[in-house]
């Protein structure tokens, strides 16, 4: 079914603090804190209910990267999700909503398993918590990748520092998947960057996001972190990304990438990121 303008769910915590989820991919397309947008969405992003949305927080599942059986980064970001629970205030005033994706004939053509994937979004005063629960409802085990492909909005990517990567091994996709070790305490991005860092620290702090503030990302059960910026080198290969936009975004993507998880029947796996405006 094609997504339409009405295919969005808005969490509103008051004080112009909102989070908007597009049911196409359950993609978080906006997170505003006191009216200030924290996420980057390309001006050329396509909202046709077909293509994945270029920006915000798309969900990569069940496969990361190019995939022999389906589209790059899997089908979750191009599937129509259901609202499991409409936004409701919790006792402390935070707002929670739940979304779900269940196997169907289209997903089974690519990945012949039964599953239920639930996304829980909690909007706090200065925090956004995004969790997934994956249930294996098949009769056999399956393996999966999962990643929150978070596009942060930044005034100038060259001024951002990212902590939590020092000493980690990484796959450099810009260098024929060569494997290197990160020596830097603070990683900067000054050129085309596409790296899968393995077993990163639980927290990343990204400096110089909107208004020169810092953003903390805390992750649970999501061991790896992808850092991506297409720069002018690969911007022009994407029809839904402006050639002048790369300075204004940085993708810091927490996920299960290098070693897929094996999930047994009737078992569940939960992972979370918390984004915190500092
Ligand atoms: O264009 P897509 O499919 O949204 O992917 C964007 C990028 O996503 C990143 O996670 C990958 O590491 C990159 O290789 C990829 O280019």
Where are the model-predicted features located?
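Beta-strand-rich N-terminal accessory domains
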Residues: 1-57, 202-223, 267-278
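Beta-strand/loop-rich accessory regions of lumenal/periplasmic or secreted enzymes
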Residues: 51-76, 163-169
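Active-site/ligand-binding surface loops and adjacent short beta/alpha elements
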Residues: 141-143, 151-226
């Amino acid at each position: 079914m094609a997504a339409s303008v009405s295919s969005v769910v808005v969490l509103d915590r008051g004080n112009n603090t909102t989070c908007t989820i597009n049911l196409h991919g359950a993609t978080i397309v906006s997170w505003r804190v006191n009216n200030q947008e924290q996420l980057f969405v390309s001006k050329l992003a396509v909202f046709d209910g077909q293509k994945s949305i270029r920006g915000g927080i798309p969900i990569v599942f069940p496969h990361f990267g190019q995939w022999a059986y389906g589209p790059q980064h899997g089908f979750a970001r191009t599937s129509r999700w259901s609202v499991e629970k409409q936004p409701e205030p919790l006792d402390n005033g935070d707002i929670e909503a739940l979304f779900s994706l269940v196997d169907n004939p289209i997903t089974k053509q690519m990945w012949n398993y039964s599953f239920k994937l639930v996304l829980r979004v909690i909007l706090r005063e200065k925090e956004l918590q995004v969790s997934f629960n994956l249930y294996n409802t098949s009769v056999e085990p399956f393996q999966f990748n999962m990643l929150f492909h978070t596009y942060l909005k930044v005034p100038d990517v060259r001024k951002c520092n990212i902590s939590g990567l020092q000493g980690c091994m990484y796959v450099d996709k810009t260098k024929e998947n060569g494997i290197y070790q990160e020596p830097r305490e603070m990683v900067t991005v000054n050129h085309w960057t596409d790296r899968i860092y393995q077993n990163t620290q639980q927290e990343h702090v990204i400096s110089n996001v909107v208004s020169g503030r810092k953003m903390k990302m805390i992750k649970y059960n999501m061991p790896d972190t992808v850092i991506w910026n297409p720069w002018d080198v690969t911007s022009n290969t994407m029809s839904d990304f402006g050639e002048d936009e790369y300075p204004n975004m940085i993708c810091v993507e927490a996920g299960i990438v290098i070693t897929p998880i094996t999930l047994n029947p009737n078992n569940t796996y939960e992972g979370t990121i918390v984004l915190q405006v500092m």
